[in-house]
Amino acid sequence: MIVLGGTWSFYPEAYQIWFIKRIFDALEDFGAGVDRTGDVWAALESASQLHPANNTPQVALHGAELQRTYNQVVQSIYADEMRRSRELGERLAEQERSPVDEYATWEELEAAHARNEDAPCRCVGLVVETRPDHLSEAEVIRIRRLGCTKVQIGFQSLSDAVLKVNKRGHDVAATRRAVKLLRRAGFKIHAHWMPNLLGATPETDLEDYQRLFGEPDFRPDELKIYPCSLIESAELMRFYQRGDWKPYTHNQLLELLIGVFQLTPEYCRLTRVIRDIPGTDIVVGNKTTNFRQLVENALAARGERSADIRAREVRFRSVDAGALALDELWYESSIGREVFLQFIAEDRGIAGFLRLALPEIQAPSFIEELQGSAIIREVHVYGQSLEIGENAPGKAQHSGLGLRLIERAVEIAAAQGYGDLAVISAIGTRGYYRKRGFDDGKLYQHRKL
């Protein structure tokens, strides 16, 4: 389950809890065959500007004409909605609550979690999106308490000069801190990176990408690559009109992305290349939606292919589990070392993997239950989906690869001197790990070594 868009950490805690609880309510309804569509639309119509009929502001923003920032304009447009949110906060402070209030308690969320553990429709991963400068120790703990296992985070650039000229609002040091916090808490890190920003060139972008995986402080597990495209409401319009910024040509972008693909390590998954923006909204910039395919075709013409996970997934291929080799890729991180365990075919096609974090044992952890623990950050087996308990010849899922990966992680952690192996399990996978020797902790599950 992915909560896309915006800065999740900006929202009040009460709203965050309510929103996630409603996700688990929806999973419960869906698993039971309950359809509450009518109730939802009725509630939206009576109580929220999210309903199209209530979303009355119709303002066209032109970046070249803005006297205020884009966010300032939007805040002025939605002043009424912001006032309503403040009033709700005041009511909550006075312990008042109405049926349509976007509010739930931690106890209500935890009860929804418990129901989902063995529900027909389980949450096997929960993702939110935020900014580096909005992450703190307390926020990371809150995100984990919600049940999240992965965080999408906008790096955009690893150049302070580029971040500053594009008014990003934070520096590279904030990104370093955020990645370290997330990694220490065991989260999977899904970064966003934007070439062709104001102040960048194809050459500096390639250097930026080399830094992304060359420096231990970064090295994300997954990555979205969003080359900058110009839309009319962006302040970048005025720079384009003055000739201070221009989009990369097709060939410039193609050569840059070929270099990017060649530099991507096997432990990273390039989940998306090119953002889905309607071509009619793009003033200038790339409008080719299958640019990834063009890059892969260009690599193939050179006798190469991307080493990233997505390019190597077995997907619908028949898999002989006995013929797979267990490969280990060790690398440094900002908290210690990482081990990327993967079951691969002869052509390095990937059938399953596990991410194991090995933090410095003596280094203090801001999460008490992780002190001195190695951490399984992800276990994933590829191939066609199967029902729980189902098996099928030639399918990677439910063929024992996950258990074999876990047992190898146990061996590595014990050999490295750890007395405990923690896992950042999703709500719907708690039962799976209990069957494999893990006990419930406060925010994680643990197996003594």
Predicted regions and their residues:
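C-terminal accessory regions of radical SAM enzymes
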Residues: 244-361
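Active-site/acyl-donor-binding loops of N-acyltransferases
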Residues: 229, 424-431, 435-449
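Short, electropositive alpha-helical surface patch
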Residues: 14-21, 201-217, 278-296, 433-444
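Conserved acetyl-CoA-binding loop-helix of GNAT-fold acetyltransferases
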Residues: 392-413
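Conserved non-cysteine loop/helix-boundary elements of the Radical SAM core domain that shape
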Residues: 6-24, 43-190, 194-251, 255, ...
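Conserved GNAT acetyl-CoA-binding A-motif
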Residues: 411-425
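Conserved acyl-donor/pantetheine-binding loop and adjacent beta-alpha core of acyl/acetyltransferases
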Residues: 344-393
